[in-house]
């Protein structure tokens, strides 16, 4: 949480008081509220990430801190294979594509993560959240497409890749790199799909529903 004008993180100070004093003062009832057997467990990003504020060192003196890095590529493939199997389970024409879909998503994510660094632009932050957003957007788009074909599906996956990864980029050169990298990854993994499927511009829209 952000600091107030006095440099205090009020929520963190409240938690520290409970840890140190074993309770807090209730100003409405003018009573001291005692707490017992209380544990606080939280997760946060490093303070070096954009928009983050370092936690109070006084509070951290009471808390063991464990650093958990992002999953490696093989772990990401295993995690998102499970999600994508559920995603495609109701689409008979797409059965058997979950492995290719997962490899394409993770490979494209990893290439972007390695190529675009936080030092270049503050929005160039890449985490597995991108893969989760990608998967959820595919789920939302496919709700009304029970008979989507493999070619249409790959084009939809490419559309969401462009929205998630390419639209945040600043320069034309970066956008070109992103587009070419996506084409390279998709054509090598979805080898059964014709190159014309990735021809731009790609925009999916539901005109009757007013969304896209």
What feature does the model see in each segment?
Residues 2-3, 48-54, 74-78:
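Switch/connector loops and helix/strand junctions flanking conserved nucleotide-binding motifs
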Residues 36-41, 61-64, 69-212:
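Alpha-helical lid/collar subdomain of P-loop NTPases
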